[in-house]
Amino acid sequence: MKDLLNLFNQQRQTLDFDAIKIALASPDLIRSWSYGEVKKPETINYRTFKPERDGLFCAAIFGPIKDYECLCGKYKRMKHRGVVCEKCGTEVTLAKVRRERMGHIDLASPVAHIWFLKSLPSRIGLMLDMTLRDIERVLYFEAYVVTEPGLTPLERRQLLTEEQYLTARQEYNDDFDAAMGAEAVYELLRTIDLQSEMTRLREEIASTGSETKLKRLTKRIKLIEAFLESGNRPEWMVMTVLPVLPPDLRPLVPLDGGRFATSDLNDLYRRVINRNNRLRRLLELNAPDIIVRNEKRMLQESVDALLDNGRRGRAITGTNKRPLKSLADMIKGKQGRFRQNLLGKRVDYSGRSVITVGPYLKLHQCGLPKKMALELFKPFVFAKLQRRGLATTIKAAKKLVEREEAEVWDILEEVIREHPVLLNRAPTLHRLGIQAFEPVLIEGKAIQLHPLVCTAFNADFDGDQMAVHVPLSLEAQLEARALMMSTNNILSPANGEPIIVPSQDVVLGLYYMSRALENKKGEGMVFANTSEVKRAYDNRVVELHAKVKVRITQVDVDTVDGKRTSGTSIVDTTVGRALLSEILPEGLPFQLANTEMTKKNISRLINSSYRLLGLKDTVVFADKLMYTGYAYATRAGVSIGIDDMLIPDEKKGILTEAEAEVLEIQEQYQSGLVTAGERYNKVVDIWSRTSGRIAKAMMDTIGTEKVENAKGETIDQKSMNSLYIMADSGARGSQAQIRQLAGMRGLMARPDGSIIETPIKANFREGLNVQEYFNSTHGARKGLADTALKTANSGYLTRRLVDVAQDVVITEVDCGTTEGLIMTPIVEGGDVVEPLKERVLGRVVAEDVYLPGNDEEPIVTRNTLLDEAWVAKLEDASVQSVKVRSTISCESSFGVCARCYGRDLARGHQVNIGEAVGVIAAQSIGEPGTQLTMRTFHIGGAASRAAAVDNITVKTTGSVKFNNLKSVAHASGALVAVSRSGELSVLDGHGRERERYKLPYGATITAKDGDAVKAGQAVANWDPHNHPIVSEVAGFIRFIDFVDGVTVIEKTDELTGLASREITDPKRRGAQAKELRPIVRIVDAKGNDLTIPNTDLPAQYLLPPRSIVNLQDGAAVGVGDVVAKIPQEASKTRDITGGLPRVADLFEARKPKDPAILAERSGIISFGKDTKGKQRLIIKDTDGSEHEELIPKYRQIIVFEGEHVTKGETVVDGEPSPQDILRLLGVEPLAAYLVKEIQDVYRLQGVKINDKHIEVITRQMLRKVEITDQGNSKFLNGEQVERQRVIEENARLVTRNELPAKYDPVLLGITKASLATESFISAASFQETTRVLTEAAVRGTRDNLRGLKENVIVGRLIPAGTGLAYHAGRRKASGLTDSEMETLSGKPAVAEPVATVADAGADEE
């Protein structure tokens, strides 16, 4: 009975902890764990196979080998339970205690723990304030260290060589103590008085001025504080007792043939014990010092190898020349405890097989082979057979099943009914990679999958395999049915759009049946209803594509009260669409289906169905769509042949034109009119334009055909060319691919991204010649190499993202903040890339939104969740910007609140409490990662580079508005832009912005602010190949520091006789020209300097290298004239780190190579005296204070003297560094920048991701702050702390009327942020396990198990979703608050640095 009670206690022990604390283990603690000392290196007796007494597998220490049986066999069976055999010393108990009983080794000499010594920064080194090198010299017996100077002039911790030691001994006799080896270090650590050391350091910090010293001091203070707080003692970092792992965790297994397989740990322990025993014997014999020293050093090395092999010196290898796996290796890395056994486990009740298509299945079904089902559901079948009385025992049932009797299959059917199974396809990149289905038994051996879920699984049927898992418990079945069923996952969590969308052949079928063609049989007929249409079609009276009139009955279902109203109307449609209307669910307007069913339209149809009619109807509808699509795709019989690739007749002409243009430019280049760079640029431009023209001609040829209509006129209509309908419907292929088949392949890129200027003029139908084929190989090979690299990189990015965001869970409904982000439409190059409605859909409004010019009545009030209806309302009111709540500004102390997050994208309503939004965000960003390119944006290597834009042509009629534009009026009456951030927008009649364009510096603008413009009108133009310098005043030119042949080179054009001057590169000028700075200054007629309007700065322009001046000294210039121009470099394909690496760089917050330099404050620009390699840029504040910035000469400064800049504006071109944006502009602009940059990469690949996912990750990157002024807080200046801790501490200080700490936000990359989380378990299982655990142990960190990862590792439900309720229930059941829980449990489960907790539950693999 007593044991029964014990049994339950054991079970309870594991569930009832609320935190895990890790600390240094004291020698006494290690002895208290131990069941005896291991004295001998022997393992087992090789004759009897019994463990040796006192050896590494000793039964007396670790427990019996067989259950309830002592080693010598004197006591057997349960009745002797708990007896210790007097003959062999074994306790009679269960054999599994050998998994948990530890032993110990008493070390004859102390040994430093390698983790605290070598793991940087060295903890022992910091504690003693000695360098690692010095400590190692002491430990490995190369030098003495003074442990107690006494009255001598020696210093404590001073190193002495052998000679110095002997001299000192002669000089001072025994007045001082010095020693070497770990004893010395142990002694030094033991005698440190932490309190007084702390006081001394604090005084020193106050008085010191040097940065490096301050850093070292704060590090030491933090370390000593950690020791004081955790109750660890410094001398415990040097071990005197070594714990021995329980033997069953380092097993020794006999193989056949009398050999043994053993864990490497046994070898390492054997080594330690051997050396320890030898050392003990030498000490007893009083051996000579040098021998003892050598033995001590060897002991130190063997313990080092046991704890962390290879950390110091060469790794100890076994017989097979492989390094032995030490304790540290057991827990770190992909094969370590954390990632192999705790975070990823193999599951029983699972099977895998190849998948095939199941086009007749319903969306919630999957076909499961009978063989598999029988195996998976075996226990259930056994139980049912017994209950039915078909078998008396389980054994009999087993026989029945093995014989596969007829009744077994009936029983299996019953067992399976309503019992969902989970299907999973690896790689599982997002949560839709595992979904639940109801199994349908099928013959054969392949799993059948519903075609519509292929997109979510990213599955195809070319040999993919999938795994099946059976949820066993009732709760698991419930969750599978309610949350994971494929019918519940219609919308994608990444963007809220339907993911159950027909693709490929289904789309083709639907598109084919909904196309309208001229003059088909039955055109113009009128039908009373759709069934009449069907009859006519079946009897071949009408053709599928004929245009007809049909009376359609439209039923509207009120979503609120379910009232049904129906109305009929006669609609112009086609036979196919009328047939399609039969499967539309009630309440879905027919006009949605009365179009060509391209993939986009089908997606829109399903989306509308979901929003209007809800889940159930949509699922049924999607299935019907699929069946219909397959049926009509079969009827269509679409196939492609080589004749479908029609080559346009114009191709020849267009090519001839282009070749002539190229020739002309080549001649200009040879006569010196254009530079080599310009020639290359222009040639590439001509070819990309030509390629576009041919593509357009080709699409026109393929996409239209001439037909006679019913009246006999010849008209153009969309053709039914097989290739074209595949691309047009979105079933397969794209315009870019057809272009290569039937147009011209176009420009190719080299692997480095530069474009080969000779294009491929042929297409695949004509075939490539040898040279063209060769040029193509670049792209093809690069594509393959990239794909391999990409997959690995993308997976690693996903892993980092998940790790940084894993603990972001919705924890409350509203945090009450009024902060948020201001959303405006995204406009690029004049097109609205993403309208406001798409950006704010599913967000919560942070401030009331008013109509422009009406401040009385808000259209939308604060805290409204914007759904489709609200968004439409905002659009009608032409609102241009809305402030919405964002996770970045959420003030929840742990996790985020539902209001700041907004809509749950996959469900379409406000997000539930407990949703793991962090993981969803990480998956949504990581899953499309494999679609992103590695470097370049090419289609099969074909360069996709737009021809250089050199003007603005408006696309809509409206009025012009300038934003933020500084311009001067040219004599011709046009305006010339002299600012860089200027923009031109086109507003429609309602004042709504329709287009927006950036105006480059030096652009000539032909329209005025407020002018009316017509669509197609050009409003601005500029030279795309040259960057001009524009004069802002009228006057005469004076050259300064123009020295011919030194700073400038004269060039005369043979053809025109015009002279131009090119400024040389300062690096190439001689030493005598160091001080020269070529400047163009503008003076009046008398030669006096003119000033730039509204400033007192002279009107002068510093000329950068390579700029060209076409004017002569003394020439007159007018306002807006070009003084000089700077040629632009040959442009590469838009290939500034593209794709995946760009996303990774942004999330890792890496500084770009040559970052843009931003203005540190607002003011007027001027230039000071240059230094050797730098230019001096000065920004003068309004109050007259100046800020200087030294900029390398090779960087191009894009601002001119006298220009006004605002804080955070770019002054030197480049990629801005996110840290600078945060420092100068703050958190919101940084968030906006990251979102924009990351979205640009994804948008280019056509991937849609909702902004809020990127915001969630950004929030995690901004978790930490840096203390700038500690006030009265416990933090130190320059320390990085969790923002939440500072806020809490400050709140406490304010209530006591003390000075709160001041801080700046810090941006950490995702890897750094993951390692800096509060939970050490989560950080250790991510990367750098050793470092994380070392630090945690020294600090005595306690992990409150708040995140998801920690709970998975300790084997609990995660505190998210359904697990949230479980955790709340657990707290409630104990009836305690968190803090009481902590005080009650006293010491939470303690793990010590030799990772016992991590190892105790896992078998040696």
Curated annotation (Swiss-Prot):
This is DNA-directed RNA polymerase subunit beta'. SUPFAM superfamilies: beta and beta-prime subunits of DNA dependent RNA-polymerase. It comes from Xanthomonas campestris pv. campestris (strain B100). Disulfide bonds: none annotated. GO terms for biological process: DNA-templated transcription. DNA-dependent RNA polymerase catalyzes the transcription of DNA into RNA using the four ribonucleoside triphosphates as substrates. Its EC number is 2.7.7.6. Keywords: DNA-directed RNA polymerase, Magnesium, Metal-binding, Nucleotidyltransferase, Transcription, Transferase, Zinc. It comes from the Bacteria. Zn(2+) 1 binds at C70, C72, C85, C88. The gene is rpoC.
